[in-house]
C-alpha cells in the first residue's frame, strides 16, 4: 500500500511488532506515541494499545496505519491519556478494528480534544500475483492412490510423482498462502481429516494431523488477500454445511457452523478481484442434485443459498480464467445419471450464467486448476471409462478439445494452483 504525504507531514515510524531491522522500538502490547509523528501499527500477533501524549498542544497530529492489514483480527485501542477524544472524556473506549485502516488525528482544544481527520480503509491493497503452476493429486482407480501430477505454466501435465501422503479419494484441495497448496480430508478406507501441504516448488509434504471432523466429498477454495482458504460441506454419516477455515500457514481450524443447504460434491472457485469465492451445485440430504450456490466474502463468510442457475448436477470441477475475475464450472453428472460437458461462466460479480455447450469428453468426478496466470485445465475423471484426458481453458474461457492424457487414469481426485514463478 502506498501512502502519500505532503511536505512537512509527520514522519512514519514502525512499532508494535518485533521488526528491529526497520529501526523502530519493538512493542507488541502497547506504545506511547509522540505528537507530529506517524506509526505503522502491526497487530499480527496481538492487539495493541496506543497511548496518546499527556499534554498535547493545539494542532498536534498523529497518524496510525494498519501495517499488516490485521486490525480486523487484532484491534487497536486508543488511550487518550487524560484528554478528550471527539468530545468524550478518557473513560470512553476508543477502538479501531477495520483491516487496512489509516487513522489521522489532530488535537483541537480541551473541549473536543483529539479529532479524527481521516478514518479510512485503504482500498487499493496489494493483490498477490496469480499462480503459474498446478497440481493434481490422489484419487481412485480400483483402489485409492496418492500419486500426483504437476502442471507446468504451459499447461503440460507431467507424469506421475510417487505418493508421499496416504492414499485417499474424495478429498479436496485449494491454494493457500498465496503460492502454496493443501490437500485435506477425504477417505483413506475410512473418513479422514489429515492434510498434506504442497510447497511453492510443488513438493507434497507427508501427512499432518488434521483438525475438524473427518469428512469426505467436500470442496475447498482460497479467499481474501491474505492467503487464507475454506473447506466446506461434505459428509460423515450425514451431509453437512460445516466449514473449516485455513490460515496463511496452512493450519486448518476446527469446525464452524456453516450456511446454506447441507450437501456433498459441490464445486468451489474464486471470482472477482479481491478474493471472493463461490460454492455451487452438489447433492443434498434427500439425494437430489441441486444447482444452488453460496458466495464467500473476502473475509471467509459463507452466505446463504443463492438461486440456482444451470442444470442441477454434481461432481463438477472449476477454474478461474482471464484477468477480469471470471471463472468456469464444467463437466459433471446430472440427475438422470448422464455425464455432461456443459459449462457455466461465473462473472466477476459471482453470478452463474446459464448452461453453454461444452467441449471435450463428457465425464464427472474430475478436477481442475488454473495455470499460467490466466488459464485453466480440467483433467482426469470417469464416465464411459476412467480417463486421464485433459482439456485446456484459454484466457477467454474457451474449453479446448481433448488432449491425450498423461499420468494414471483416475477419478475422485483434487487439484490446486501453486507458485508465482513460471
Segments from the language model and where they lie:
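Short, positively charged, Gly/Tyr-enriched micro-motifs
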Residues: 23-25
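Kelch-like beta-propeller repeat domains
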Residues: 93-96, 104, 119-422
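Short beta-strand edge segments in extracellular beta-sheet folds
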Residues: 27-30
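Beta-strand-rich extracellular modules
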Residues: 17-21
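A short, polar/charged loop/turn motif at coil->beta-strand junctions and beta-hairpin connectors
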Residues: 33-36, 72, 128
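Acidic, glycine/polar-enriched metal-coordinating patches/loops
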Residues: 1-15, 44-124
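Glycine-centered loop/turn motifs
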Residues: 35-38, 59, 100-101, 305
Amino acid at each position: 500500500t502506498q501512502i502519500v504525504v505532503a511536505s512537512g507531514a509527520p514522519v512514519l515510524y514502525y512499532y508494535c511488532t518485533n521488526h528491529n531491522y526497520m529501526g523502530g522500538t519493538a512493542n507488541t502490547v502497547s506504545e506511547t506515541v509522540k505528537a507530529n509523528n506517524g506509526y505503522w501499527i502491526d497487530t499480527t500477533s496481538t492487539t495493541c494499545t496506543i497511548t496518546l501524549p499527556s499534554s498535547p498542544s493545539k494542532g498536534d497530529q498523529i497518524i496510525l496505519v494498519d501495517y499488516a492489514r490485521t486490525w480486523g483480527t487484532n484491534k487497536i485501542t486508543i488511550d487518550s491519556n487524560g484528554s478528550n477524544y471527539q468530545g468524550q472524556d478518557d473513560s470512553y473506549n476508543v477502538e479501531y478494528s477495520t483491516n487496512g485502516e489509516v487513522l489521522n488525528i489532530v488535537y483541537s482544544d480541551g473541549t473536543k480534544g483529539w479529532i479524527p481527520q481521516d478514518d479510512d480503509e485503504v482500498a487499493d491493497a496489494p493483490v498477490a500475483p496469480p499462480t503459474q503452476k498446478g497440481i493434481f493429486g490422489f484419487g481412485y482407480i480400483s483402489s485409492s492412490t496418492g500419486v500426483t501430477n504437476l502442471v507446468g505454466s504451459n499447461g503440460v501435465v507431467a507424469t506421475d510423482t510417487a505418493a508421499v501422503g496416504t492414499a485417499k479419494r474424495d478429498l479436496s484441495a485449494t491454494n493457500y498462502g498465496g503460492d502454496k497448496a493443501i490437500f485435506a480430508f477425504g477417505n483413506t478406507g475410512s473418513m479422514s481429516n489429515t492434510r498434506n501441504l504442497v510447497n511453492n516448488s510443488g513438493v507434497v509434504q507427508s501427512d499432518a494431523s488434521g483438525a475438524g471432523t473427518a469428512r469426505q466429498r467436500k470442496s475447498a477454495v482460497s479467499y481474501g488477500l491474505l492467503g487464507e482458504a475454506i473447506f466446506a460441506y461434505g459428509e460423515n454419516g450425514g451431509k453437512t454445511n460445516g466449514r473449516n477455515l485455513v490460515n496463511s500457514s496452512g493450519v486448518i481450524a476446527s469446525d464452524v457452523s456453516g450456511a446454506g443447504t447441507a450437501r456433498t460434491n459441490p464445486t468451489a472457485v474464486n471470482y472477482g478481484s479481491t478474493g471472493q469465492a463461490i460454492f455451487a451445485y452438489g447433492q443434498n440430504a434427500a439425494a437430489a442434485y441441486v444447482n444452488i450456490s453460496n458466495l464467500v466474502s473476502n473475509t471467509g463468510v459463507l452466505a446463504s443459498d443463492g438461486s440456482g442457475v444451470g442444470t442441477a448436477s454434481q461432481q463438477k470441477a472449476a477454474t478461474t480464467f482471464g484477468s477480469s475475475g471470471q471463472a468456469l464450472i464444467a463437466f459433471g453428472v446430472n440427475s438422470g445419471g448422464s455425464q455432461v460437458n456443459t459449462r457455466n461462466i461465473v462473472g466477476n460479480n459471482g453470478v452463474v450464467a446459464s448452461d453453454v455447450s461444452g467441449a471435450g469428453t463428457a465425464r464427472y468426478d474430475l478436477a481442475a486448476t488454473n495455470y499460467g496466470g490466466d488459464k485453466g485445465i480440467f483433467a482426469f475423471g470417469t464416465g464411459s471409462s476412467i480417463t486421464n484426458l485433459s482439456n485446456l481453458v484459454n484466457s477467454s474461457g474457451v474449453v479446448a478439445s481433448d488432449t491425450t492424457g498423461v499420468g494414471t487414469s483416475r477419478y475422485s481426485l483434487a487439484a490446486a494452483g501453486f507458485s508465482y514463478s513460471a
